[in-house]
């Protein structure tokens, strides 16, 4: 029996952003990284665990360009899915273009195909405006996501507000979420990050119809540069979505830069 759940990962994508710097601040040379996530989940009155493991490698060159190839294994209870991903970005003057693709073979709960792209422009005084789109094709649904955002960079710190306008084309359901996050350079070796998201159907774009499915997410991370080549990230977070979903998550990641 296939899982009727299209939930998105809570923390892993944010963990990866904390492991390496954002494209506008990427530091050069090839890298390898690993990330893992363990969640205690209560859904529909039952308790289960979700796990994500990720290995990746790529290149980032001084904020000018970069690419990443990754493999992920997602497990929810007794069900497991594998997914392959490729992402890249390129900066040209004040413009930054990025995109990615994800593919899974005969998945139980994760998407079959994912396509995304974003165009960002540096507008001055540390501000960057973004416009993004993501297409997600599941076994039983097609989801479109529009993602406007604005970021502010100041002396190594960053604040971002990002919106998610989500439409399930299969059921014609729509939802929206706002994500606020910030990271700061506490010291040359330590970067701290935290954020929150508020909205509806954050975890399931095909949530129970005729319900508000109001949801929230909170998270925090610490990124520590152990050596010039080795970085670790530890994080924690929690989430709730009406009427009956709760999640508590711990994450750990590491990156080796050559």
Stretches with model-predicted labels:
Residues 49-53, 80-84, 93, 111-115, ...:
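Residues that define the transmembrane beta-barrel architecture of outer-membrane proteins
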Residues 30-32, 61-69, 94-99, 125-131, ...:
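Repeated loop/turn-to-beta-strand initiation elements of outer-membrane beta-barrel proteins
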Residues 155, 180, 247-258:
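Outer-membrane beta-barrel "beta-signal"
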Residues 96, 105-107, 181-183, 189-231:
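Outer membrane beta-barrel transmembrane domains
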Residues 59-61, 90, 121, 152, ...:
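Residue-level signature of outer-membrane beta-barrel architecture
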Residues 24-81, 85, 89-94, 202, ...:
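Outer-membrane beta-barrel initiation region
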Residues 121-202:
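Detector for outer-membrane/organellar transmembrane beta-barrel domains
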């Amino acid at each position: 029996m296939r899982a009727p759940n299209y939930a998105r990962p809570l923390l892993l994508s944010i963990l990866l952003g904390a492991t390496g710097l954002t494209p506008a601040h990427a530091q050069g040379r090839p890298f390898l990284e690993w990330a893992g996530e363990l969640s205690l989940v209560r859904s529909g009155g039952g308790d289960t665990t979700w796990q994500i493991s990720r290995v990746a490698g790529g290149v980032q060159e001084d904020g000018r360009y970069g690419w990443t190839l990754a493999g992920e294994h997602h497990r929810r209870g007794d069900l497991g899915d594998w997914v392959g991903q490729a992402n890249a970005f390129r900066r040209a003057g004040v413009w930054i273009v990025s995109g990615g693709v994800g593919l899974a073979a005969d998945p139980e709960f994760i998407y079959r195909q994912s396509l995304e792209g974003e165009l960002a422009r540096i507008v001055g005084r540390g501000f960057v405006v973004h416009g993004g789109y993501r297409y997600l094709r599941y076994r039983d649904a097609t989801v479109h996501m529009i993602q406007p955002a604005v970021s502010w960079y100041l002396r190594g710190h960053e604040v971002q507000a990002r919106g998610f306008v989500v439409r399930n084309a299969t059921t014609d359901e729509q939802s929206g979420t706002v994500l606020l996050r910030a990271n700061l350079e506490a010291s040359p070796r330590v970067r701290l990050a935290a954020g929150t998201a508020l909205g509806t159907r954050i975890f399931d774009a095909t949530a129970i119809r005729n319900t508000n499915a109001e949801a929230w997410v909170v998270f925090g991370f610490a990124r520590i540069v152990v050596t010039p080549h080795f970085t670790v990230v530890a994080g924690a977070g929690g989430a709730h979505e009406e009427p009956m979903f709760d999640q508590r998550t711990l994450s750990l990641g590491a990156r080796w830069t050559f």
